[in-house]
Amino acid sequence: MATAAVAVREDSGSGMKAELAPRPGAEGREMTQEEKLQLRKEKKQQKKKRKEEKGTETETGSAVSAAQCQVGPAKHLAGPDSQLGTAKEKVPAGRSKAELRAERRAKQEAERAMKQARKGDQGGPPPQACPSTAGETPSGVKRLPEHSQVDDPTLLRRLVKKPERQQVPTRKDYGSKVSLFSHLPQYSRQNSLTQFMSIPSSVIHPAMVRLGLQYSQGLVSGSNARCIALLRALQQVIQDYTTPPSEELSRDLVNKLKPYFSFLTQCRPLSASMYNAIKLLNKEITGVSGSKREEEAKSELRAAIDRYIKEKIVLAAQAISRFAYKKISNGDVILVYGCSSLVSHILQEAWAKGRQFRVVVVDSRPRLEAKHTLRSLVRAGVPASYLLIPAASYVLPEVSKVLLGAHALLANGSVMSRVGTAQLALVARAHNVPVLVCCETYKFCERVQTDAFVSNELDDPDDLLCERGEHVALANWQNHSSLRLLNLVYDVTPPELVDLVITELGMIPCSSVPVVLRVKSSDQ
């Protein structure tokens, strides 16, 4: 009589035995196909049972962990008598390994929660008792830090120490500032930055000293003009540069230029276009091969600067002029604001090609820059009228379109331009007049800004003083502690007020700025 073999499995966790059905083929005879299939099914069922048992053990362990996680901090905060998870507790016999692991994990979470609670009592961050699950949202309210990055005292001290380490003179603040803009440096033309600077012993190249003085005195203004002047000065610096012995040009020249940029920043903050030009120049310098001769490498760098000026500024202005020409019709009344070299070039090109239109030039104090635009248009024969910004709302009913320049185009589509631009765009929207912004793509930056408070530039407050004969309004204003003068340079226009941005790549909406930035970064 054949004896049937019984497969017995003893579970190490629970001590239970599971008996399976008699296994055929135990006498040594060859198993049939049906018996093999049946044996295979039995093995699958065994694996399935093992997985189910492990799943129940894991669920039990997580439930215990969650329960102890909720109760644990309260027990620890209650008093020293309730000690959870100490070595004095005896582990009851007959528990599985999974349960022991879950209990140990719960004890660790409780101890961690107690430590966090103690830190919270001492003024630290609020305790996080348990890690939240995937579907839960944190119930605690996140608070803003006491200082943002722009007015953080430690960051400001670090920025002040940096020019000192580079042996760069620092400009002192002038007068009292409005509290909203206390984190921005206050510039004054009365405080000379180079008064006690000795040119032979200074680390700053004379070309950079001359450029910084031109920036601070307002002799070179405008994003394009400032960027071109910077690149020409860098060409002179590269021409006079000599690589020290046991040094590489690609490394030493980058470090050599850092104090120069710090000095220019002390004279006047760099524009977004200048930052992009410096970034590309540093990339060109670091890409110089060490096997090249010094003269060859320097000539290549100067050629790269010439190529950048031609492609990004000169040719870009010509392409923008062709696109903007399509938007100008005969009989148009075009309103422009301030002094934009690009807008002035577009209007003169359109007039030279035969378009008949009239220009309304809007200006604002204290710089009155639009007078330069007015002179260039009158010199080219373009009919133009001139007024100040408070009277702009009276002429907008007869204006057909507004043509504006830009200091920078931010990643969120906002336009950073001369202060007063946002006001004009808002009044134009109220009169249903389209607003067109002309801007080269090298002015696009990855910075995001929705207002003019976080990052801006404060010009000399003495420019606001109005001189009428011998009488000067607001004279000796520094002696009045309750009086503060604010001379903002830029404002931020939201993208909702701009209908179109004309670039060398074509006419795009403000929302396409991130796309252009992405394409430019991939090309580089």
From Swiss-Prot:
This protein's UniProt keywords: Acetylation, Cytoplasm, Initiation factor, Phosphoprotein, Protein biosynthesis
One GO CC annotation: cytoplasm
List of residues that carry N-acetylalanine: A2
Keyword Transferase: no
Compositional bias ranges of the Basic and acidic residues kind: 26-40, 87-121, 161-173
InterPro entries hit by this protein: IF-2B-related (IPR000649), IF_2B-like_C (IPR042529), NagB/RpiA_transferase-like (IPR037171)
Residues with Phosphothreonine modification: T86
A biological process term (GO) from this entry: myelination
Ranges for region Disordered: 1-173
Transmembrane segments: none
Keyword Plastid: no
Ranges of biased composition (kind: Basic residues): 41-51
Residues with the Phosphoserine modification: S12
Localization (cell): Cytoplasm, Cytosol
Region ranges (May bind the chemical integrated stress response (ISR) inhibitor ISRIB): 171-180
Domain of life: Eukaryota
GO MF entries: guanyl-nucleotide exchange factor activity; translation initiation factor activity
Description of how the protein assembles with itself and partners: Component of the translation initiation factor 2B (eIF2B) complex which is a heterodecamer of two sets of five different subunits: alpha, beta, gamma, delta and epsilon. Subunits alpha, beta and delta comprise a regulatory subcomplex and subunits epsilon and gamma comprise a catalytic subcomplex. Within the complex, the hexameric regulatory complex resides at the center, with the two heterodimeric catalytic subcomplexes bound on opposite sides.
PANTHER family on file: TRANSLATION INITIATION FACTOR EIF-2B (PTHR10233), TRANSLATION INITIATION FACTOR EIF-2B SUBUNIT DELTA (PTHR10233:SF14)
Record's function text: Acts as a component of the translation initiation factor 2B (eIF2B) complex, which catalyzes the exchange of GDP for GTP on eukaryotic initiation factor 2 (eIF2) gamma subunit. Its guanine nucleotide exchange factor activity is repressed when bound to eIF2 complex phosphorylated on the alpha subunit, thereby limiting the amount of methionyl-initiator methionine tRNA available to the ribosome and consequently global translation is repressed.
Protein name stated in the entry: Translation initiation factor eIF2B subunit delta
Originating gene: EIF2B4
